[in-house]
Structure formats: structure tokens, C-alpha cells
């Protein structure tokens, strides 16, 4: 979604500031017209601040911020691991918090701006094995609504975008708890994984619909 959004906005003559945890990931974007790539790790306050300072130096104004970074973790609560829980919270929720917090002063001084947080239908409905992913997306929903009330006097709008399984590599990259040897758990893991992959494969037209909606 992030790459498709960057390309769509750039094609519509926006200056796109594309941030990523490794610039190697953005090699195919670096020579595209209107796209400017910056190193930024959403889990690192220092990295966010460094990127922000460079971006503000390079551009006079910033009109919109899209928080898109996200990872998945499909696990039973009993089998969950602290490191994986920490990772999904740091990326999916605290990443949104930290990046938003960094750029709010820029928008406030400009007296305009828009913060768009990519959430998910998972922020509204729940599925088994999604205890941690759904929790982070629901946190983004609540955080965004509260922040919107705080920033309205500064002409800064905040919204979330909730969509289902887009045809990206997200599902393939989801971290899953290992086979447990518990028949009920293993059967449910297979069932949920199969359903999500099938839904993802069907939604081939969802990504362009999302990018078009963001631009509007």
C-alpha cells in the first residue's frame, strides 16, 4: 500500500516524501519523478527526529502525513512471545504515535495539515489469532480520534483508513506462532490462515481503490 500510494500521489504531481527503514527497499522509487526517499525507523525516536529535521530543511511546507508502517502477528495468546508482542506494538501503534508527535509542531506552525493513519477493518472487528494485531489497530483508532479533537483549532485534520485484505505481500510476511502439537490450535491456525489468504487473493482491485481514495 505504501509504495502504491507514493507512486499514485507522485503521478498526480505531489512532492512525495517516502520514508523507509532501509533505503535499499526504495531503490525502485529513488529515480521516480516527484519522489524523495528518506531513512526513517518508526520504532526509533532518534531516527524519526533526524528524518524530520532533514525533511523540514528540504521542504518549505508539509501538507499531509500518512502513517502506513505495519506488521502482522498471528498467534494464540498462550503461545505468544514477548519479542513479537513488543515488535507489533512498537511498529503498529507506537510508530504512529511517535511519527505523529514529531510532525504535529510542523503542522501547528503552518496552521494546516492532515494526518492519515492507515488502520484496518481489524480495528473494528475481531478474529481469532488476532489478539495482538487487532489490539494495535484498535489503539490506532482511539488514538486518532482523541488526537483529532486536540488539533482541530490548528486546522489539522486526522483520519483513519480501514480496509480489508489487499493483494499485497502482507499476509505472506505475517509472523505466526509455530505448530503447537495441540490439535485444536493447529486446526484453527490452518483455517484462519487459509481464509485470509483466499480473501487476499480475491481483492486484486483493492490497492488502487485505496490509493485513489487517499488522494481524494
What does each of the following model-derived ranges do?
Residues 100, 136-139:
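Active-site helix of classical SDR
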Residues 40-50, 82:
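The beta1-alpha1 cofactor-binding region of Rossmann-like NAD(H)/NADP(H)-dependent oxidoreductases
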Amino acid at each position: 500500500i505504501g509504495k502504491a500510494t507514493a507512486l499514485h500521489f507522485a503521478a498526480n504531481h505531489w512532492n512525495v516524501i517516502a520514508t523507509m527503514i532501509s533505503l535499499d527497499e526504495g531503490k525502485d522509487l529513488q529515480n521516480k519523478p516527484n519522489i524523495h526517499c528518506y531513512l526513517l525507523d518508526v520504532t526509533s525516536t532518534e531516527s524519526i527526529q533526524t528524518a524530520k529535521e532533514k525533511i523540514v530543511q528540504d521542504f518549505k511546507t508539509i501538507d499531509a502525513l500518512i502513517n502506513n508502517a505495519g506488521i502482522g502477528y498471528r498467534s494464540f495468546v498462550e503461545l505468544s512471545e514477548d519479542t513479537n508482542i513488543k515488535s507489533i506494538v512498537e511498529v503498529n501503534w507506537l510508530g504512529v504515535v511517535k511519527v505523529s508527535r514529531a510532525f504535529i509542531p510542523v503542522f501547528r506552525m503552518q496552521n494546516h495539515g492532515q494526518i492519515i493513519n492507515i488502520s484496518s477493518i481489524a480495528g473494528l472487528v475481531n478474529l481469532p489469532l488476532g489478539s495482538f494485531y487487532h489490539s494495535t489497530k484498535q489503539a490506532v483508532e482511539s488514538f486518532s480520534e482523541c488526537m483529532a479533537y486536540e488539533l482541530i483549532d490548528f486546522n489539522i485534520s486526522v483520519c483513519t483508513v480501514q480496509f480489508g485484505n489487499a493483494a499485497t505481500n502482507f499476509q505472506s510476511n505475517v509472523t505466526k506462532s509455530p505448530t503447537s502439537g495441540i490439535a485444536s490450535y493447529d486446526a484453527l491456525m490452518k483455517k484462519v490462515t487459509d481464509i485470509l489468504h483466499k480473501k487476499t487473493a480475491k481483492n486484486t482491485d483493492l490497492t488502487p481503490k485505496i490509493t485513489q481514495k487517499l488522494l481524494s
